[in-house]
Design a protein with these regions (language model features):
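Short, flexible, basic/aromatic active-site loop/helix in glycosyltransferases
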Residues: 42, 59-85, 100
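A short, conserved alpha-helix in the catalytic core of glycosyltransferases
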Residues: 22-28, 83-103, 108-139
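Conserved acidic donor-binding segment of nucleotide-sugar-dependent glycosyltransferases
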Residues: 504-512, 520-525
Length: 557
């Protein structure tokens, strides 16, 4: 029948299966996402709710495991997309063209058994990947098709065909497969010849809520695109959605749930040997893990501080003179320097932090990296006459953003509105009452918005303001505005760390000069178009995947 199939994909489904809701599209999605994916398969679950398999493992003697058999199908280790040795033929999808190139199931395995394993090996032989898709769930009433007695009926071919399979693929099995039951962590995802990275952060990156999470998410995407196997440990071990599923569909193993929260040390001890790199984020999270990893791991430790907390808080002290801020800054300084001295490499988003660290200790290995990474770029045609309003974007869980908006509303915006009647849109998660309850004429508090709505605002507003009075390092909101080609007016703190930004954005610190600059550029269409064009050229040059990878690849390779 399959010889007459006209569709792009062939689907094989046993007669003893029951498909679950929304089972088909996830299989198609994997095929369409990557042209090198040749075959995909479903998560198979028994009728009693236990897992039958999350992909299959073949050992070097041709014996096989249904990975995860009789485990909880909702456990995190069974819910990420990954390469797999084979997929049980109860529910598999293959490219029709590839199926015909291979010639279908090898007839030496007629009438049953090992034909699915052999097909997976043929798919790889032809240059394609075999993937497991956990979002496609199929109940398999195993045994109904061929029974369970290996001495009778078609079931008797199971042992016989395993011997045939071993003879056909002996060299491949001995070269690329593990002895039975060994190194399951690697075997389950065909990870023998891949580098593995454990990424630790405060929680699964909620990239539409704060700049730090967006940075983490972008770096995860880049590392996956470079072929690394990623395990992600969020310190709260919570399954935030839709963010967790998005990582899992990228092929990232996310640790979540009580099993890992209560036993993370035991899990790390058991699997520490498999990680080539430990990529740790933020000082208050890293301090919990770095000593344990340093003591027991062989892999390299890379620490990304996101910003220098002690520098940011010291600047806040310089602004308000509160003694407790000075004390807090000193505590952060002690902790951050301790972490940096334990790490093999330290990342910060600008030369400002690198210089500040080396002024304290020139021996600390530190590198200025690019905070944001873009795979694709927009071609923005900036039309001032179709835009209106001034936009601020920043999460209010970060104190400098709250201070910036309050200062702008108090000292800058009243005169701006009086002169140009431009509405002020405030976007950011975790907005406190003093922001959400604002009733000032012209001020529109949007609070948290989706990525789609944020993009609409970037495409409809005329100007972005970043009126930060303190902070440290490169500001993600500035980079994002550059990406969307929307002109920026900012302070020197907002512009910090972005080399050459003064040739693109308008930078002013003094209140009246900032007011004048906003009013002037807002009404100058020619200048707005010029800034937009320069912004897009700049971000393409500095923030592409290739540009970022050139900076960090030596640390990961």
């Amino acid at each position: 029948m399959e010889l007459y199939a006209k569709g792009e994909y062939l689907l094989f489904l046993n007669n003893d299966t029951q498909v679950q809701q929304d089972w088909l599209q996830p299989l198609v999605d994997l095929m369409e996402k990557d042209a090198t994916t040749g075959m995909v398969g479903s998560k198979l679950v028994y009728a009693d709710g236990y897992l039958q398999e999350a992909g299959g493992i073949l050992w070097d003697d041709a014996s096989a495991w249904n990975y995860g058999n009789r485990q909880n199908p909702n456990d995190s280790e069974f819910n990420f997309v990954h390469e797999t040795d084979y997929i049980s033929g109860a529910a598999i999808m293959i490219r029709t063209k590839l199926w015909k190139e291979i010639g279908g199931f090898d007839e030496r395995f007629v009438p049953a058994y090992c034909e699915d394993s052999d097909l997976a090996f043929e798919v790889r032989k032809h240059g394609y990947k075999v993937l497991y898709q956990p979002k496609s769930v199929v109940v398999h009433f195993e045994g109904i098709s061929n029974g369970t007695d290996v001495t009778a009926g078609q079931k008797k071919y199971q042992v016989e065909n395993q011997k045939k399979f071993y003879e056909k693929w002996k060299n491949e099995l001995e070269k690329n497969h593990f002895p039975n039951g060994q190194d399951v962590f690697l075997a389950r995802e065909r990870g023998r010849n891949k580098k593995h990275i454990l990424v630790i952060d405060h929680y699964v990156p909620q990239y539409d809520k704060d700049a730090g999470s967006k940075t983490t998410f972008m770096y995860l995407k880049m590392l996956v695109s470079k072929g690394y196997q990623i395990t992600f440990l969020g310190d709260n071990f919570y399954q935030h959605e839709p963010y967790t599923t998005e990582l899992q569909q990228m092929g990232i193993f996310v640790l979540y749930g009580p099993k890992y929260a209560e036993n993370w040390k035991e899990w790390l001890m058991e699997n520490m040997q498999y990680f080539d790199i430990f990529y740790l984020n933020r000082p208050h999270i890293t301090i919990k893990y770095i000593d344990f990893i340093k003591e027991h791991a062989r892999g390299k430790i890379i620490y990304y501080g996101h910003d220098l907390h002690f520098l940011r808080i010291h600047r806040e002290y310089e602004l308000d003179g509160q003694k407790e801020k000075l004390e807090e800054s000193e505590k952060w300084k002690e902790q951050e320097l301790y972490i940096m001295r334990q790490a093999d490499m330290n990342y910060y988003p600008s030369m400002i932090e690198e210089q500040a660290i080396h002024e304290i200790d020139s021996k600390i290995p530190v590198k200025a990296i690019t905070a944001y990474v873009y795979e694709k770029f927009m071609d923005v045609v900036y039309e001032p006459e179709k835009r209106e309003g001034i936009l601020f974007v920043g999460g209010f869980g970060h104190a400098p953003n709250l201070d910036a908006v309050q200062w702008f509303l108090d000292k800058i915006y009243p005169d701006v509105y009086k002169n140009i009647k431009a509405d002020f849109y405030i976007v950011g998660s975790k907005a406190p009452d003093e922001i959400t309850h604002i009733t000032t004429e012209g001020v529109i508090v949007k609070g948290f918005v989706s990525e789609e709505e944020l993009q609409q605002l970037y495409n409809s507003c005329k100007l972005v303001v970043v009126p930060l009075r303190y902070g440290a390092g490169v500001k993600g909101k500035v980079v994002e505005a550059l990406y969307y080609g929307i002109p920026i007016v900012t302070t020197s703190v907002g512009a910090e760390g972005i080399k050459g930004i003064e040739d693109i954005a308008v930078v002013e610190d003094q209140e009246q000069k900032l007011i004048d600059a906003i009013c002037k550029v807002y009404q100058n269409d020619e200048k707005l178009i010029e800034i937009s064009e320069k912004s897009q050229l700049y971000v393409r040059e500095k923030f592409s995947t290739d540009a970022v990878w050139d900076i960090v690849k030596e640390d990961f390779e």
